Amino acid sequence: MLSPLALIFIAALAVFVACAGGASLAFLALGLCLVTGLDPANLVPAMPYAGSLLLGLSALALSLLSVLGTGYSGLFLSQLLKAYFRWARNRLFASARPPLPMNPQLGAASRRKVRTIILVALAFMGVSFVAGFAVLAMSAGSPGFWHVWHWFA
């Protein structure tokens, strides 16, 4: 019932959703490490706390954006499967059931809430990242603060 091309596309989209979920968790872990100052695996380089706090807040906002993107991609995958199986069933049995939309149909209130959360998180992420970069550059005395602190040496 599934064509090979459709199966490959659906599998690729499912892998994308899984990877995006993993990225959401990674951004969350990075944000928490930067905000709290805890670094159990010693992966985050040393930096002043003010810059670390601002970059951590930026990473937490990015995690929220990634969670919302993952959720929407999961809804899209689910709706795409429903629409494809409806279409295939109509073709197989010569049925006249109406086709389903390919995109997820969210209610107006849900769309507004998600859009507002995305816009606020995106603005907060941008402002906190630029502020964190500026704080780190000023505390190092150079725009390339990672060179001053020998992060990659």
Region spans (language model):
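Cytosolic juxtamembrane amphipathic/interface segments immediately preceding
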Residues: 5, 100-114
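Hydrophobic alpha-helical transmembrane segments of integral membrane proteins
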Residues: 1-85, 115-143
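Membrane-proximal, acidic/low-complexity disordered segments on the non-cytosolic side
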Residues: 145-153
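Juxtamembrane inter-helical linkers in multi-pass membrane proteins
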Residues: 79-106
